[in-house]
Amino acid sequence: FTTFYREFGSVLKEGLGEDFGNRERILKLLRFSTSNNDAVSTSLQDYKARMPEGQKAIYYVTADSLNAAKNSPQLELFKKKGIEVLLMADRVDEWAMEFVHEFDGTPMQNVAKGAVDLGDLQDAEEKKALEAAAEQFKPVVEKLSDSLKAKTKEVRVTTRLVDSPACLVTGEGELSPQLIRMLQQAGQAVPESKPILEINPEHPLVRKLENSAQFDDLANVIFDQAVIAEGGLPD
């Protein structure tokens, strides 16, 4: 099966968008790398069996390469908490997952889309800390939003980051950079889309913004670093 999957895994994934009647069967055949294991060997059944008590979703991230997926800043909080994340680096993954919202009754959640919510896996103290940081950094966020309004849809404080100053996320219901690139390469027209910039209030570079005389320059450095970590943005 491993040899077969290496050759035809991408074809199987295409079936998620083309063969609705067999979607559940196809999902059971898929195999993924994870943040705990580089080998393309984990099924969705395996992942669910390893989920800790309190985890309410199957978490995954898409990227242009396995290395990019493994080093995605969006994984930092999950790694810190020891939560396994599926790594999807096949070109067809982002498109295929648009047709998958749950597996065996458990929601599928792209960790790079929307606000991060770990539910019971995130304690009340962490949620309070985020609220306090959001209030403290409100002036910085407003200033950043204005400085980067041509590049971002929104700027907000997040708890998903541990080591990185910032990351880019896609709004709920919007197309990801990977999917936009894929559609553009296929010659399809794509609506204009801007990413959401999330900042880490604990990072020294972000804290430096509070009293920086070169605010706009520093804001652009932070944004550009987030773009590089994302593997670039579509044209």
Where on the chain are the PLM-derived regions?
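Conserved GHKL (Bergerat-fold) ATPase module
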Residues: 1-235
